[in-house]
Amino acid sequence: PYEKIGAELVKEVAKKTDDVAGDGTTTATVLAQALVREGLRNVAAGANPLGLKRGIEKAVEKVTETLLKSAKEVETKEQIAATAGISAGDQSIGDLIAEAMDKVGNEGVITVEESNTFGL
């Protein structure tokens, strides 16, 4: 039963990451697994679980603050293409995303669907 709880926790982390960011599920899963492993190791060694929780929350706050300070706005079509190309691992896809975003504007919606036809 404990294994199932852990698996459900990691599954929820991946789902929430995908819902919020649309990317990063592998990183989130690896981080969640490390947090659980190290948390259990520390509790087994006598650490206070509530103290660990508070420490994790403080660390998350600091990391979030640091990331937000270093974040840069992505505004131009070229920046969007570069960012999307890196995320997709394919610059041509990045260019397509930038073109689509340019056409629909900031308030527009882009729907991406999987196709069974290759190259069409």
From Swiss-Prot:
Positions of ATP binding: D23, G24, T25, T26, T27
Top EC class for this record: isomerase
Gene Ontology cellular-component terms listed: cytoplasm
Signal peptide per UniProt: none
Cell compartment(s), UniProt: Cytoplasm
One GO-annotated biological process of the protein: protein refolding
Catalyzed reactions per annotation: ATP + H2O + a folded polypeptide = ADP + phosphate + an unfolded polypeptide
Annotated GO MF terms: ATP binding; ATP-dependent protein folding chaperone; isomerase activity
Database matches in Pfam families: Cpn60_TCP1
Keywords: ATP-binding, Chaperone, Cytoplasm, Isomerase, Nucleotide-binding, Stress response
Entry keyword annotation includes Transferase: no
Classification via InterPro entries: Cpn60/GroEL (IPR001844), Cpn60/GroEL/TCP-1 (IPR002423), GROEL-like_equatorial_sf (IPR027413), TCP-1-like_intermed_sf (IPR027410)
Chaperone among keywords: yes
EC numbers: 5.6.1.7
Subunit record text: Forms a cylinder of 14 subunits composed of two heptameric rings stacked back-to-back. Interacts with the co-chaperonin GroES.
Xref: PANTHER family: 60 KDA HEAT SHOCK PROTEIN, MITOCHONDRIAL
Function as written in the Swiss-Prot or TrEMBL entry: Together with its co-chaperonin GroES, plays an essential role in assisting protein folding. The GroEL-GroES system forms a nano-cage that allows encapsulation of the non-native substrate proteins and provides a physical environment optimized to promote and accelerate protein folding.
Family: Belongs to the chaperonin (HSP60) family.
Protein's name according to its UniProt entry: Chaperonin GroEL
High-level lineage: Bacteria, Bacillati, Actinomycetota, Actinomycetes, Mycobacteriales
